[in-house]
Regions:
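A short hydrophobic beta-strand segment most commonly corresponding to one strand
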Residues: 84, 135-151
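Short beta-strand His + acidic residue motifs that chelate non-heme Fe in jelly-roll/DSBH
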Residues: 74-76, 94-95, 121, 127-134
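Conserved short histidine dyad/triad with adjacent acidic residue
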Residues: 63-78, 122-124
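N-terminal leader/capping segments at the start of a protein or of a new domain
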Residues: 1-36
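Long hydrophobic alpha-helical segments typical of transmembrane helices together
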Residues: 161-178
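A short glycine-rich, His/Asp/Glu-containing loop-to-beta-strand
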Residues: 40-71
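Glycine- and acidic-residue-biased ligand/ion/polar-headgroup-sensing regions
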Residues: 69, 80-100
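Short acidic-glycine-tyrosine-enriched beta hairpin
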Residues: 84, 99-127, 166-170
Length: 178
């Protein structure tokens, strides 16, 4: 059976608490969408990626993230939130990190996610998402956070201090978005 974006959101709206990661990534894999369905939300930031809110339910937020070449997220965790990501257009590079007993982080690997590929993370998983494609090759990804990810723990390769990052979310007016 075809899983449309409205059907997907209706499924997520049925949850009254945090959505399990395996459910989220499985349903993102089954989702049948095209980039055209998200055109009104494709807003890019000049200096950093941009998080565009497209839908909000009781226990989740759905955002379209728009990345220009060279833009990347901070190295971060998901602090009490589950995150499922589906690449809508372009290629995302996800770099995974682990932490030593002393608090230092180190990369354990990177992998490319092409169009329609899905990944997921939650809680203390540490990662970074990047668009490392040549200039002019944008990345667009759909992110579902359950519950909403409003503050991330951030990490540095040169310091053991865990920071906090509040990533702005852009909502839409005039009938678009929520």
């Amino acid at each position: 059976m075809r899983l449309t974006l409205p059907d997907f959101f209706a499924e997520l709206d049925g949850f009254t608490e945090r959505i399990p990661l395996d459910f989220l990534t499985h349903r993102l894999t089954k989702l049948e969408v095209s980039l055209d369905e998200f055109r009104q939300y494709l807003q890019f930031g000049a200096n950093t990626y941009r998080r565009n809110l497209i839908h909000e339910g009781l226990c989740y937020q759905a955002l379209v993230l728009c990345w220009r070449s060279g833009q990347r997220s901070p190295i971060h965790d998901h602090r009490g939130s589950t995150c499922g990501v589906r690449v809508l257009s372009g290629v995302a590079i996800e770099t995974l990190f682990d932490q030593t007993e002393g608090g230092w982080i180190y990369a354990t690997g990177s992998h490319a996610l092409g169009e329609n590929q899905v990944c997921g993370s939650q809680d203390s998983d540490i990662h970074q998402v990047s668009n490392l494609r040549p200039r002019g090759e944008n990345l667009v990804s759909l992110h579902i956070y359950s519950p909403a990810l409003l503050v991330m723990g951030t990490y540095s390769l040169t310091d053991v201090t865990r920071g906090e990052f509040t990533d702005p979310i852009y909502a839409f007016a005039d009938g678009a978005g929520i």
